[in-house]
């Protein structure tokens, strides 16, 4: 019986990067069937593999039709691995659904994750979260990226412990093996470059770097520059760049535009440090990429980040820009501290799997012979009782 691999929920971002890394590293063969969006990164990952690919165009109706087609393949014993997202619609009872779950905000209801959205935009995000919660509940097994979120799923939201697994993140082969095939904008050669490798999602709190730049500007400290990877035409990018220009902070920022996974490694090598100021993450590939490429990491001080990074990062408070200024200045001025943080990051990375080990762990779970449909009580019920 073939293994169905459902990547249809993925269109961009870290999830797509992880899926491509899985396809490159996993020992898959013709006994697998991959369903995914029509994306060059997926097609490239499978180009030299004899793995059937069912590529679908973008659009909600194409997705619905494709997922119904996947569900029809089921006989109640067929395993479908969805990475990352809800299982195919209409598949409950037809397929044994194993899902990779990276929707951290669903497990932190105490955080107003969409506080930056108003009106219809906020309503849209709320409806999407409802669908994701409903879809995730219809899975049979759940794979999380961190122990912290897996514990929350079990202890606070009634996920059955014997059906919850953790597969820790690994550095993406696309990033580690990347060589640049595009011309990047010139980066200031005499500045300490801190890379924030992220899109313009409000959760990333990239705007906090403006407050950091203002604090540096007030001190006439021009030794630092933040390297951003934002799509130039995105409304959020235009607003951010307008704020930067309004305050006269252009010398503190360089936006290189969207960077494909296969080009990311070349950019990381050109920078001195990496940062992640997100309010919440399931797990960030920024962590393992910084450690693997021997760059110090600055990250939000929170339970989810400490659970993943241990002593392999400098913890900062984005709402208090002076904490970021102090961290950057120490990294720039104290070579021993810089080297120590790089070494600690490498030590934390040693506790994580390689891309091949991670892929093998996924396969060990989804190829188990004792997988069955879940017939127990509905998950999420504790959340309803607490609200």
Protein language model annotation of sequence segments:
Residues 121-142:
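Membrane-proximal helix-turn-helix segments that form the acceptor-binding/catalytic region
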